[in-house]
Amino acid sequence: MPQAEDKRQAAREVIDILHEISTLLNTNLDRTELSLCVSLIENGVNPDALAAVIADLRKETAPTSRHVLPE
């Protein structure tokens, strides 16, 4: 089906462009993560809420910068 292949190619191009923008903005999102975000937004998820969740998850998984001082 040429039409289905055209749609897949267009989707790949969109993700490639979004990945380039994401890289310029230092979002640290890979193509898979961007694709999932696009899918969630297309299905009605609020983009601001999604951004807040991603930021919260990054805070939770970020290594702590606290240093234990010897006593």
Curated annotation (Swiss-Prot):
One of the protein's GO biological processes: gamma-tubulin complex localization
GO cellular component: cytoplasm; gamma-tubulin ring complex; interphase microtubule organizing center; mitotic spindle pole body; spindle
InterPro entries: MZT1
Origin: domain of life: Eukaryota
UniProt keyword terms in alphabetical order: Cytoplasm, Cytoskeleton
Record flagged with keyword Cytoplasm: yes
Subcellular location: Cytoplasm, Cytoskeleton, Microtubule organizing center, Spindle pole body
Pfam families: MOZART1
Similarity remark: Belongs to the MOZART1 family.
Record function comment: Required for gamma-tubulin complex recruitment to the microtubule organizing center (MTOC).
Subunit structure: Part of the gamma-tubulin complex.
Protein name: Mitotic-spindle organizing protein 1
Organism name: Aspergillus clavatus (strain ATCC 1007 / CBS 513.65 / DSM 816 / NCTC 3887 / NRRL 1 / QM 1276 / 107)
